[in-house]
Swiss-Prot record:
Species name: Amblyomma triste
Record's subcellular location: Secreted
Functional note: Salivary chemokine-binding protein which binds to host chemokines CCL2, CCL3, CCL4, CCL8 and CCL18.
Record-given protein name: Evasin P1180
GO cellular component: extracellular region
Classification lineage: Eukaryota, Metazoa, Ecdysozoa, Arthropoda, Chelicerata
Keyword annotations: Disulfide bond, Glycoprotein, Secreted, Signal
Cystines in this chain: 38-58, 54-95, 71-100, 90-109
Main location: secreted
Amino acid sequence: MARNWSFRVIFVSAMWCALLKFATLEEPKDGYDYTEGCPFVVLGNGTHAKPAGCSHLCNGAPETLDDNMECYNVTEEVAKRMTPDIPYTCWLGWCSKGECKRDNRTEVCYRGSERE
């Protein structure tokens, strides 16, 4: 009886691993190529993250985020100099033509550690 039980555990484990492999290899269905470009610097607030600014240079070419995307009104240079895991007060804004247009709201934000 113990032999039959161990076979079932091994079989279920193998099936679970196969399912995970195929589930994680699936390509995104939105048509966007996530392998191109340079990642934007993001700052967190404990529940989600937003980009620092709305544009940057990627291999000498400008990249901009879509209009009406929420952002932190902080340049990437300033965000990179922030001490990791220390809370800061950041102005919120909305991307408009590559610029984070500040509104009258602030929230706590922080730069994550490099290991994240």
